[in-house]
Regions:
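Core, highly hydrophobic multi-pass alpha-helical transmembrane subunits of bioenergetic inner membranes
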Residues: 1-572
């Protein structure tokens, strides 16, 4: 089934890509309305939009999906239910296709909800408690976005249609469209894991690595960015762009810091994805949707390759994901090492690789734009952090001595794994130049002073040196480094966002319940209630009983006392 799915998706991807380039060349779009049924004059219509943007993105999704499924033939070879896994992945691709080619909010919701539901099934695919917790966090975080789209559908009820593409200029200044745009921004922030919804993205690493290569490169996490690219005319109209710009830059900065202090290989790559999503969101908020789309396509290719290389390493190292156990992998797995380093350099923006054409253009547009010093600093500092964690990954995994078992041997075994990586390697190298001439037939005219032109390469070199320094650093009992432990804990745990999204929600009510039961149920309530009355009665009974256990004087005194009372009563 893997081979059949691979050839089908690869063939469809090629056809759709050629069609997308043709539509781009002649500036052509197709708007299809398929009437499902007509009831008393009310039509139920399925609407599709086929323009160059949707077709090229769909072809990239199918191309990466085909290679991921082919890669799974080796990676999931010991899986008993491999066909079930492939079916779930195909449902995932179908949901993404619905989202891409729909200009209608209701059909977008079908794809959006489908992505959330199927991603939950994939995250909990390995059935253990950690996977269940990660799946629940993923599903509940994405539910917020689903609810936002549902509310926006309700707000659009008065417009006569849910095809948002009609309303860019028609009711651009209406109050309803302002609310809808804010809800769409909220939905995109949840799906693309922006602050404060970032915690589900590293948690979703509990899924199999082929799923990570698909989900965190071209599908689930980019759905929010793609939706905002479609809604980009509304962002600047309703002043949502400054908020989105700040959140995107903050997410990029937070993810870069977290990746430099993480030791789990898949989580480092997930945090790098989060950093690039923040970059896409922020450049989109600055008013460059084409540039955000260009980086989305380039990032999808080299990030899928990076995940495939990480999966090959994990597969050969008996499912060990800690980079401290790696080292000298370049001697054992040369093909994986070449692919891994090419994708890492592309992520950093190495000249003439795929990431360079989009990332360098983004940073030059940042220098050219009217933004304040804080945003400018966050952009370039985050770029340095990207180079830092990329060099740190190289340092731990490729250089030095092998830190795994001394009697252990591994190599680039597996034809399907190698084929998937090689197919993505070549397109990761050449796609940047190809896409730059396709998406921008007329290049941007950027005039910058010499020091701003060389600022990007300077920041990358300094970031790589910083990555080397933190790779060689360690805690010392004689220095003040342990005084900084709480700061490192804050920065390395995504600013405590996983805690705020999970334990914090239940922590305070449970703590309040514990202290309430301890203060009331186990103390005051118990002493004033059943246990208190029981103790009082026992005390009184023992006290009265002690009288009868005494000598004859007590009986005589009691007799005289009662006789006195009777005399007083009868005398009255």
């Amino acid at each position: 089934m893997c081979s059949l799915s691979f050839f089908s998706l690869f063939f469809m991807s090629t056809l759709i890509f050629i069609l997308g380039i043709y539509y781009l060349m002649i500036d052509y779009s197709v708007f299809i309305e398929w009437e499902l049924f007509n009831l008393n004059g009310s039509m139920v219509v399925m609407t599709l939009i086929l323009d160059w943007m949707s077709l090229i993105f769909l072809s990239f999704v199918m191309y990466i999906s085909s290679l991921v499924i082919y890669y799974s033939e080796d990676y999931m070879s010991n899986e008993k239910n491999i066909n079930r896994f492939i079916m779930i992945v195909l449902m995932f691709i179908l949901s993404m296709g619905f989202l891409i080619i729909s200009p209608n909010l209701i059909s977008i919701l079908l794809g959006w909800d489908g992505l959330g539901l199927v991603s939950y099934c994939l995250v909990i695919y390995y059935q253990n408690v950690k996977s269940y917790s990660a799946g629940m966090l993923t599903a509940l975080s994405n539910r917020i976005g689903d609810v936002a789209i549902l509310i926006s559908i309700a707000w659009m009820l008065n417009f006569g249609s849910w095809n948002y593409i009609y309303y860019y200029d028609f009711i651009v200044n209406s109050f309803e469209m302002k609310i809808i745009t804010m809800l769409i921004v909220l939905a995109a922030m949840t799906k693309s894991a922006q602050i404060p919804f970032s915690s589900w993205l590293p948690a979703a690493m509990a899924a199999p690595t082929p799923v990570s290569a698909l989900v965190h490169s071209s599908t689930l996490v980019t759905a929010g960015v793609y939706l905002l690219i479609r809604f980009s005319p509304m962002l600047n109209t309703y002043n949502c762009s400054w908020f989105l710009l700040f959140i995107g830059c903050l997410t990029m900065f937070m993810a870069g810091l977290g990746a430099n202090l993480e030791f789990d290989l898949k989580k480092i790559i997930a945090l790098s994805t989060l950093s690039q999503l923040g970059l896409m969101m922020s450049i989109l908020a600055m008013g460059y949707p084409k540039l955000a789309f260009f980086h989305l396509l380039a990032h999808a290719l080299f990030k899928a390759l990076l995940f495939m290389c990480a999966g090959s390493m994990i597969h050969n190292l008996k499912d060990s994901q800690d980079i401290r156990f790696m080292g000298s992998i370049v001697n054992f797995m040369p093909l994986t090492s070449v692919c891994f380093n090419v994708s890492s350099l592309s992520l950093c923006g190495m000249p003439f690789l795929a990431g360079f054409y989009s990332k360098d253009l983004i940073l030059e547009m940042v220098c050219l734009s009217w933004i304040n010093c804080l945003i400018f600093f966050l952009y370039f500092f985050s770029t340095g952090l990207t180079a830092s964690y990329s060099f740190r990954l190289f340092y731990y995994s490729m250089s030095g001595d092998n830190s795994f078992y001394s009697s252990f041997s591994f190599d680039d075994k597996g034809f399907y794994i190698s084929f998937g990586m090689i197919a993505l390697l070549f397109i990761s190298v050449f796609s940047g130049s190809l896409l730059s001439w396709l998406v921008f037939p007329i290049p941007y005219m950027i005039v910058l002073p010499f020091y701003l032109k060389f600022l990007t390469i300077t920041v990358v070199i300094l970031g790589s040196y910083f990555g080397y320094l933190i790779s060689n650093s360690s805690f010392s009992y004689n220095l003040f480094s342990f005084d900084m432990l709480s700061s490192f804990s804050f920065l390395g745990s995504m600013w405590f966002m996983p805690f705020l999204s999970t334990n914090f929600i239940s922590y305070l009510p449970l703590k309040f319940g514990y202290y309430s039961s301890k203060s009331f149920d186990y103390s005051w309530g118990e002493m004033l209630g059943g246990q208190g009355l029981y103790s009082l009665f026992i005390y009184m009974i023992n006290y009265i009983q002690s009288w009868y256990d005494s000598n004859f004087k007590i009986y005589l005194l009691t007799f005289i006392f009662w006789m006195f009372i009777l005399i007083v009563l009868f005398s009255l």
